[in-house]
Amino acid sequence: MSDGDYDYLIKFLALGDSGVGKTSVLYQYTDGKFNSKFITTVGIDFREKRVVYRANGPDGAIGRGQRIHLQLWDTAGQERFRSLTTAFFRDAMGFLLLFDLTNEQSFLNVRNWISQLQMHAYCENPDIVLCGNKSDLEDQRVVKEEDARGLAEKYGIPYFETSAANGTNISQAIEMLLDLIMKRMERCVDKSWIPEGVVRSNGHTSTDHLNEAKEKGICGC
């Protein structure tokens, strides 16, 4: 796809504590590479990737492909950047929430991150995929899989164990998030009612229309 040759531009936000591997996960997804020497993200950065999304119909048939331009925003996890990070929440359509399987505190802080999303995202029930990262460091693991899955079930969100080092489940997690977003859009009767985190190729976007749709009970926020 050439520049501008897409149906939707969709913004995802990766968030979580500092050092959980957000930058490495996004780099692995967009470039297929791992760099263990990334410096800590200061403020906000982003990466991009073009994908084709095909939804399965009720009869199992694969629908027409939608050309998607993904913007994957990488946020600083440090507390001193929190106000800057939350300012970007409302502009994102989906959220990849990461914690470090070798760092229990990063797992305990997941609840705080979800609370922040519920307060600052475009609606109180945004689409989130939870990722326990660094699954390749099995000998250093301190967070049990059943605990992580239990937390994800409590919030009703998908859970993946990922590794930026070898790429395990990274594409699957982001594809799941994209699928949630596209299905939310499909639940809107009028496809012009799409949040700011989604931009059509003609540049049109409207949070006001999304709010109107929510008030009428049309859109699935």
Swiss-Prot record:
Positions where lipid (S-geranylgeranyl cysteine) attaches: 219, 221
Instruction: Note the topology in the membrane.
Output: Lipid-anchor
Reactions catalysed, semicolon-separated, are:
GTP + H2O = GDP + phosphate + H(+)
Q: What is its main location?
A: membrane
Question: Where in the sequence is N-acetylserine found?
Answer: 2
Q: Name one GO molecular function term.
A: GTPase activity
Cysteine methyl ester occurs at 221
Location of the protein in the cell: Membrane; Melanosome; Late endosome; Lysosome
Q: Which GO terms describe its biological process?
A: antigen processing and presentation; blood coagulation; complement-dependent cytotoxicity; cytotoxic T cell degranulation; exocytosis; exosomal secretion; melanocyte differentiation; melanosome transport
| UniProt keyword list | Acetylation, Disulfide bond, Endosome, Exocytosis, GTP-binding, Hydrolase, Lipoprotein, Lysosome, Membrane, Methylation, Nucleotide-binding, Phosphoprotein, Prenylation
Q: Name one Pfam family in it.
A: Ras
Under the heading PROSITE patterns, the entry gives: RAB
What is this enzyme's class at the first EC digit?
A: hydrolase
Question: Coiled-coil stretches, from where to where?
Answer: none
| SUPFAM superfamilies (UniProt xref) | P-loop containing nucleoside triphosphate hydrolases (SSF52540)
Which InterPro entries does this entry report, sorted A to Z? P-loop_NTPase, Rab27a/b, Small_GTP-bd, Small_GTPase, Small_GTPase_Rab
GO terms for cellular component: apical plasma membrane; dendrite; exocytic vesicle; Golgi apparatus; late endosome; lysosome; melanosome; multivesicular body membrane
E.C. number(s) listed in UniProt: 3.6.5.2
What this protein is reported to do is described as: Small GTPase which cycles between active GTP-bound and inactive GDP-bound states. In its active state, binds to a variety of effector proteins to regulate homeostasis of late endocytic pathway, including endosomal positioning, maturation and secretion. Plays a role in cytotoxic granule exocytosis in lymphocytes. Required for both granule maturation and granule docking and priming at the immunologic synapse.
Q: Which PANTHER family match?
A: LD44762P
Q: How does it assemble?
A: Binds SYTL1, SLAC2B, MYRIP, SYTL3, SYTL4 and SYTL5. Interacts with RPH3A and RPH3A. Binds MLPH and SYTL2. Interacts with UNC13D. Does not interact with the BLOC-3 complex (heterodimer of HPS1 and HPS4). Interacts (GDP-bound form preferentially) with DENND10.
Q: What is this protein called?
A: Ras-related protein Rab-27A
Organism encoding this protein: Canis lupus familiaris
